[in-house]
Amino acid sequence: MTHIRRFAILALMFFTMLAVKGQVGESRSRLGVGVNGGMAFNTISFDPTIKQFQHKGLSFGLSMRYTCEKYFTTICALQAEINYTQLGWKEEILDAYGAELEDTYQRDMNYIQLPLLCRLGWGKESGGLQFFILLGPQFGYYISSSAKQSDIWTLNSEGHPNRPNNVYQQYDMKDPDNKFEYGLTGGLGLEFSTKHGQHIMVDGRYYYGLSDILDNGKKDVFARSAHMTISARLTYLFDLFNK
């Protein structure tokens, strides 16, 4: 039921964004399409905690933006993307007593992601700069993964990896239990628009995962295992129409 409630909140949030178009203001009808690319810096929010470095990966895909209204000084738009993103985690490995080990482990996970964003901007619509914020739900679907493990692999007396709180079950994962994931994303950025309908944007975002990649039942090891992502992105759009 928890996942159903979370999904209902996301759906309500998105339909609230759509209602922006119904506000009283100066009507706009501008559709821009293009491409985006950048970097994703990811960790997994594990409970019990696993100490990690930032996992670095690429993120790129297609972007679409529909500008529907200018409400006083606020330019209102809906933005959707379909992106290929490299996520995962990279462990900072300690032994059961908290001492650093030479062991290394990294899990690379590839996703197709669909952010559906409300975009509010202030500044020039063409021929200048515009500041904007983004907020909305994001959905993802797992495609594949791979692991990188050092030749040095420290074991305890029972033959298991020597780790804090005896937590090592993450190494047994071949694929996540839950391939579909969702959460909330938000960010801010700057856009430069030409007078000929071309737009270059740079933004930074934070994604907070609401779903777990591993099962979290009473008999499972992890109570939580969700993606947490900081990303930086460059986007190029050109207007298909501007009415």
Indicate where each model-derived feature is located.
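Short loop/turn motifs that connect adjacent beta-strands in outer-membrane beta-barrel proteins
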Residues: Q23-L31, E69-C76, G123-Q130, T194-H199, ...
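Short glycine/proline- and aromatic-enriched beta-strand/turn motifs that initiate or cap beta-hairpins
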Residues: Q23-R65, D177
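Predominantly the C-terminal beta-signal and adjacent terminal strand-loop region
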Residues: R28, E181, G186-K243
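Residues on the lipid-exposed face of transmembrane beta-strands in outer-membrane beta-barrel proteins
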Residues: V35-M39, F60-Y66, Y84, L114-W122, ...
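N-terminal hydrophobic signal/anchor transmembrane helix of membrane proteins
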Residues: R65-A77, T85-K90
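Hydrophobic, well-structured mid-protein blocks that either form specific transmembrane helices
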Residues: E102-S144
